[in-house]
Amino acid sequence: MFYNNPLLIKLKNKLYKKKKIEGIVKSTTKGFGFLEVDSKKTYFIPSKNMKKVIHGDRIIGLIKLENNKEIVYPKILIEPFLKKFIGSILKKNNIIYIQANYPYIKDLIFYRYKTSVFRSWKNGDWVIAELDTHSLRDNNHFSINILKFISEKNDPLTPWNVILSKYNLEKKSPKINFNYILNNNNLKDKRIDLTYLDFITIDNSNTQDIDDALFVKKTKKNKLTLIVAIADPTEYILINTKVDDIAKKRVFTNYLPGFNISMLPKEFSEDLCSLKPHVKRPVLACKIIIDNEGKILMKKTKFFLAWIESKGKLSYQNVSNWLEKLGNWQPDNKKIKKQILLLYKMYKIRNMWRKKNALIFPDNIEYKFHLSKTWEILNISVEKRSIAHKIVEESMISANICAASFLKKKLGFGLYNSHSGFDTFNAKNAINFLKKYNIIFTLEEIMTLSGFCKLKRKLNKLSNKYINYRIQKFQSFGEISLIPKPHFSLGLPYYATWTSPIRKYSDMINHRLIKSIIIGKKKISPPDTNIIPQIIHRKYKIRMALKEIEEWLYFKYYNKKKSDKKKYQANIIDISKGGIKARLLKTGAYIFIPVTYIHKIRHELNLNSEKGIIYIKNKIYYKVSDIIIVSLLKINNGNKKIIATMIN
């Protein structure tokens, strides 16, 4: 009887007029939205009120009661979500509109804008813009400022240009006035001449920035002496110089489909420092003695400065084919042949030692985009890691193990790659999960390096991809540390990389530390602590840019095959309430299968994201790691997602 009482409604509204709430705006595809106060409480924002705000805005809203329902009226903007963004031009009847290209706000179109960019705008032009005025703060309207033109719609390089702009990453390798570069370090007298040794390089056939060369020989006592020689850019690049500042800002060489954007000017990375064949080059070298069981005799490890001359630039494919007795390629001479065979022997005994005493990363399939000269996608191929890849990788891991030990012993600091295995909370979850499969570990055991290695070896023998997936989910992320810490995933007490100083600034830092020890520098300072968050942030941006460029290229590739009704094998990699995320085995493209295409009767379906399992009528039908058969339904132009359906 009180439900529609006018006096009661009036009283409630009086109370609600004073009720203000702060939260974050969440939009929906249907126009209305919600104000999220915390993870448990949200308030409804009708479509008309959503026109004053943008998804992600932090606002203060007034709560009113309408039809006995709590409604938010946005009142004060605390912080706008949209600041600088990527957008595209829409041109209708000679009127310019700008559409934001951002998740959740793709439907937001601005028609008020200003710009200092002089251009006759075309439909589909990509731009960088920033929010100038906000409807909730400035005169009830939105407006933007177009800062920069990125690319035309039909430019074949648009995917690269747009995504690199989105993450504020460079589109070209750095350029400098190369004439000023001199040998500033005066270390010529401290370098040992090893140009007479038969060093070789093994890389991709088109690689120009060659940063490692290898030489190995057998000793009288049936041991192997491996010398890993690494290009030495710090011979020419002093700390806090212009080129060093460039490298410090870029942090990594950015490897993208079709081309690379180098960390250093190419005059350094592909010429002056590159270990090209038959050219004398300065290097930082590590001599590693390996016994016949594959163990590194750490006390006999030696770091030193040297001159080398590579006797041959070999490709991964040719070396692998020759070792597997495939194809027609032959080493140029007996000396190179001997080096390949000895390196292969080194790989086998070192790999065997690490399997027994540390951990080996599983082989992951990689995919390569084959592009035409006009940047069209010709094909996508599966790239498996070859024997030659593994030879070089094993050599670099050995050198990095030695560097970690050397820096720990001499300085007690450096840039260390570390991984802590599990935190306490997830260790307990992992233990409880493993019990279901009769795999028993204590908390104390699983949180030690030896216990973690024991677990991983047991799982490798078990060869259950689902269990591996669940355990992987419980694991911590890798870290960078200034002090020596264990690397659980490698099964090593400490690990520090230094073998790619022309591609990674962190390796250049460790280079300088090792060189400082070699030349007897008295005062050696630890790396600046600010470099670690910079490396992590830059790595994240590069990884996200690569992911989104590849998504765009997959979109282009499959957009041409819209009518393709082929069946594809796909690996389930994630399960959420909304559906299945999977990866096509043939090309590596990520697909999404909405819940409606998994099973027609929704109430019979249970998608457990935590367990990574799909139940139908309470029976397990699909789980993460399963291989399923799918067909592609549609390609979403807005978010570049590929939608697929299950084929039973």
UniProtKB/Swiss-Prot annotation:
Protein name: Exoribonuclease 2
Keyword flag Coiled coil: no
Residue ranges occupied by any S1 motif domain in the UniProt entry: 565-647
GO cellular component term of the entry, any: cytosol
A GO molecular-function descriptor: RNA binding
EC class name: hydrolase
Purpose of the protein: Involved in mRNA degradation. Hydrolyzes single-stranded polyribonucleotides processively in the 3' to 5' direction.
